[in-house]
Amino acid sequence: MTFYEYMQTKTKQTDIIGFIAREMSMDNKLFPSLELKKLSIPQWQERILDKVVTGVVQGYVMDGFQTAVKEFEAI
């Protein structure tokens, strides 16, 4: 299972992990030619964080991303 596939199981969550999962899903649908499903975890992290403009939100998203990675690695 890839990180993208794992995150697709989290899209219905109402927390930050669900938000990140929905952003990943939306990016993949908007840019199918980029083959985003194949991105590594650091590449996804960079892509999602590039969308965040304020430091407070960036910290929140970063914490959520790190939690999602820990959950994924625990599988």
Regions found by a protein language model. Give the residues of each.
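A general alpha-helix detector
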Residues: 2-6, 43-48
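Ankyrin repeat (ANK) tandem alpha-helical domains that serve as protein-protein interaction scaffolds
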Residues: 26-31, 46-75
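A Lys/Arg-rich helix-loop hairpin that forms a DNA/phosphate-binding surface
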Residues: 35-36, 40
